[in-house]
């Protein structure tokens, strides 16, 4: 099913993103794109896994242009980017809305625009 396919994982440096990446890394998938706004975690992953299937995209789901940049040529998406700590979301509700709601809308918009086959959206 994933042979010669490209997978995009938003929030790819987070706990779920790492788990999805590890699951697919040993498969016959062509490319796994890790999309996140954490440059340090991306660099750590790049060094740890040292695998040509992994491609890293620095960006933010709140920015449609950066999402579209990573989405071009993608077959499947696991959307795991989110602010998930309840105290943080309560203290910064606007940031939570921007990331969790508008960010999800950006991911879905880009996926539709680029003809992605399937998007899996996670929620906590």
Outline where the language-model segments fall.
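N-terminal Rossmann NAD(P)H-binding glycine-rich loop of SDR-like oxidoreductase domains
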Residues: 5-27
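Conserved Rossmann-fold cofactor-binding substructure of NAD(P)-dependent oxidoreductases
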Residues: 55-76
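Conserved glycine-rich Rossmann-like NAD(P)H-binding loop of the short-chain dehydrogenase/reductase
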Residues: 28-41
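Conserved Rossmann-fold NAD(P)-dependent oxidoreductase catalytic core, especially the SDR/UDP-sugar
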Residues: 76-79, 83-124
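Adenine-nucleotide cofactor-binding loop residues
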Residues: 40, 62, 84
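Conserved residues in the N-terminal Rossmann fold of short-chain dehydrogenase/reductase
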Residues: 36, 58, 98
